[in-house]
Amino acid sequence: CTQISVAGATSTNDTVVALASGKAGNSKIADEPSSAAKLLQRALTALCQGLCKMIAWDGEGANVLMEVIVEGADSREDARKIARSISSSSLAKSAIFGQDPNWGRIACAAGYAGPKFDVNSLDIALGETKLMEKGQPLPFDAEAATGGGAGRAS
């Protein structure tokens, strides 16, 4: 599930649409889980994820891209709610923008998202740098966690 938030809002200006008319006369690949369907799914997913990042980077004044990945949630909807809560949190966004690897702001936003989760299984990372594992803070290199000033955190 890929979604973007540019300045906390979504508009038709931030939309990507893929359509198929069927006019080529090819067989429908949605009718069966064929290798062609799987290949198309992977290609469209990669394309859309790339376009989402380009749209976000193209936002007025954008100089930081925050990518939130939630794994292990009870459902896709729970994962979506947690990711949206983190990506919409003014405190989490301020920390990322200010290159402050404040895991507490991320954990807080996940906590008030609504879905229940076990804090003792919470892992938080910025890029490849783990900040928290199984609910326990870890020692980390702040510069590595913030990309060394590169302006990108995931």
Task: Place the predicted regions along the sequence by residue.
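A structural signal for small-residue-enriched, beta-sheet-centric alpha/beta enzyme cores
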Residues: 1-154
